[in-house]
């Protein structure tokens, strides 16, 4: 008689063959049915367990398929030799002490972070209509796409960039990807040597480059942008810059400094490159935006142009793009032609139509009006809440944030703590110091105005005043 340690239960809802398989497999793993054991014949075991032969056959087939047993011709099924496992006492892990409960953070009342955008400005109806039309008319979009991105979108981007940013390129030079971080990760192995980054600057870009094995050096930013003098003495072969709207200072690099930067790169053709992150160039409120560095350099110049739809449309769209110099295209294709595209083809084709049919430029025009009104409201609220000589505002002409420098400011740590206590999400200029304190960036708020409504700014300004007062009081008592 063959005995199972676990009885089969016809009323359990689990098929009998699965129950039999699980029971036999467990006994084989534990060694209760030793390796080398000849298993009972199907009819005999079926009779002993009062089940059908089909039930036993199904369980045996699964056990054989998974290697628990092997069938031998005219001899039956045998338990595999390697299945018997040594038994050992179960190790009971030491108890883990409960973590102390964290104090609840005050809710955010005013989001003045630099990454904020207003989802209410997204063109929902137009975007949904275009996607619906594509869904029914273009089933081929469910298939694999080009690693560089769909040609229709690349052509639409090339045309748009030439007209509005002065970028000189063909669709062949455009690469579409799911975010700036992804594109930087692809770009990093193609470029030579050390990369210079701006300080204060974009920590995420520096981190992505370093994650991909690129050594970075941090160079100072002055009133005209990245110091080319410092760059020339740095030994860097690549520089990463945000010339249209330096992040986070808001400086726009003038034509003279741009020319100096291009001369630096052109002195060593093929050995020096500029990564131009065209951050916030769409949002220049009071004057026309300057043409891109890439446009000044030309299609064969040493500039890689980067941009994204995260600000102009929405972060969740996850569409970014770069324009490669023609001389880098062979290396890019050799390395990445086997990759799959990272952006939904439906999203790509929707954006292509959105651009081609004129919706994108009209959408940007509406956004500029809305964000300019918010910039004005934030600036007015700050001027009303603070004395004229107490706060200096800069970086107002472009982008979705401004800088507010305090006179006789309390320590930044006190300002951060007071802002958190008041429910204000914001940044300080020192948060973007990439060198760990080599320069003094203290006492300056970096205030985004993309998330809040105009009506919220008067109270937000008064709350910032309270933040400064509380921070001063806290720093005096320490």
For every predicted segment, state its role.
Residues 1-132, 139-142, 327-328, 333, ...:
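N-terminal basic, amphipathic alpha-helical segments
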Residues 74, 296-331:
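Active-site PLP attachment segment
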Residues 112, 274-275:
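Residue-level marker for buried hydrophobic side chains located in beta-strands
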């Amino acid at each position: 008689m063959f005995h199972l340690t676990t009885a089969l239960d016809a009323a359990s809802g689990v098929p009998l063959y699965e129950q039999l398989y699980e029971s036999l497999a467990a006994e084989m793993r534990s060694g209760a049915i030793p390796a080398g054991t000849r298993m009972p014949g199907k009819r005999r075991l079926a009779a002993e367990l009062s089940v059908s032969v089909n039930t036993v056959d199904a369980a045996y087939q699964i056990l054989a398929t998974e290697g628990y047993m092997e069938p031998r011709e005219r001899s039956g099924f045998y338990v595999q030799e390697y299945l018997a496992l040594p038994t050992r006492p179960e190790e009971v892990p030491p108890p883990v002490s409960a973590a102390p409960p964290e104090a609840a953070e005050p809710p955010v009342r005013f989001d003045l972070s630099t990454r904020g955008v207003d989802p209410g400005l997204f063109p929902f109806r137009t975007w949904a209509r275009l996607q619906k039309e594509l869904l029914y008319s273009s089933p081929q979009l469910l298939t694999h796409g080009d690693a560089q991105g769909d040609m229709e979108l690349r052509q639409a981007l090339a045309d748009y960039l030439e007209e509005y940013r002065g970028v000189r390129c063909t669709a062949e030079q455009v690469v579409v990807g799911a975010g700036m971080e992804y594109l930087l990760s692809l770009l990093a192995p193609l470029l030579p040597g050390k990369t210079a980054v701006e300080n204060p600057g974009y920590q995420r870009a520096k981190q992505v480059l370093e994650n991909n094995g690129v050594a970075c050096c941090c160079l100072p930013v002055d009133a005209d942008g990245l110091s080319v003098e410092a760059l020339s003495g740095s030994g860097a072969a690549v520089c990463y810059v945000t010339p249209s709207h330096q992040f986070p200072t808001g400086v726009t690099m003038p034509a003279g400094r741009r020319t100096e930067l291009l001369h630096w790169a052109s002195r060593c053709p093929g050995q020096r490159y500029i990564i131009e992150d065209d951050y916030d160039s769409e949002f220049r409120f009071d004057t026309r935006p300057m043409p891109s560095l890439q446009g000044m350099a030309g299609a064969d110049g040493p500039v890689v142009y980067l941009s994204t739809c995260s600000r102009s449309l929405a972060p969740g769209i996850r569409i970014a793009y770069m324009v490669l110099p023609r001389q880098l295209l062979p290396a890019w294709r050799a390395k990445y032609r086997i990759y799959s595209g990272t952006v939904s083809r439906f999203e790509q084709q929707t954006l292509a139509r959105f651009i081609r049919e004129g919706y994108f430029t009209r959408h940007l025009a509406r956004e500029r009006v809305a964000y300019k009104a918010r910039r004005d409201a934030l600036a007015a609220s700050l001027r009303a809440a603070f004395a004229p000589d107490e706060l200096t505002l800069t970086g107002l002409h472009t982008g979705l944030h401004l800088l507010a420098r305090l006179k006789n400011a309390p320590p930044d740590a006190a300002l951060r703590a007071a802002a958190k206590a008041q429910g204000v999400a914001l940044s300080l200029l020192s948060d973007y110091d990439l060198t760990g304190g080599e320069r003094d960036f203290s006492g300056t708020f970096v205030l985004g105005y993309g998330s809040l409504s105009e009506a919220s700014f008067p109270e937000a300004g008064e709350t910032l005043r309270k933040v400064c007062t509380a921070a001063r009081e806290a720093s005096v008592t320490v």
